[in-house]
Amino acid sequence: MEDSKIIDLYWERNEKAISATEQKYGSYCYYIAYNILHDQEDAEESVNDTYLGAWNAIPPHRPNMLRTFLGKITRSISLKKWRDAHRDKRGGDEVSLVLDSQSYHL
């Protein structure tokens, strides 16, 4: 299916837009997500989140190049997921305090 027809389906809020997107760009989006996340399950989740992101963005946005539009959404979602996973490994949102000898004396 042509990109313009897929975009029209999104614009009409037709759920066939998601299946058409998956059929045409699913492997492309998965490739992007997997190369960032290196985990099959996380990559699949990012791709599904990409479809939701496209659904929420079209309308009002009507992308000129659907492939690029989806790639940017996938990349953004995957990078956020990667950062969240690695932040947790570093201690999450905890702030560690380093006390030197000067700050110890109050």
Roles of regions detected by a PLM:
Residues 2-6:
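Acidic, Ser/Thr- and Pro/Gly-rich low-complexity regulatory segments
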Residues 21, 25, 29, 50, ...:
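Residue-level preference for hydrophobic side chains embedded in well-ordered alpha helices
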Residues 90, 97-106:
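Acidic, proline/glycine-rich intrinsically disordered inter-domain spacer in sigma factors
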Residues 20, 42-46, 65, 69, ...:
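Alpha-helix N-cap and coil->helix boundary residues
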Residues 75-93:
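Arg/Lys-rich amphipathic alpha helix in sigma70-family domain 2
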Residues 11-12, 38, 48-66, 84-86:
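Sigma70-family region 2
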Residues 11-20, 30-49:
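Short, charged helix-capping/linker segments at alpha-helix termini
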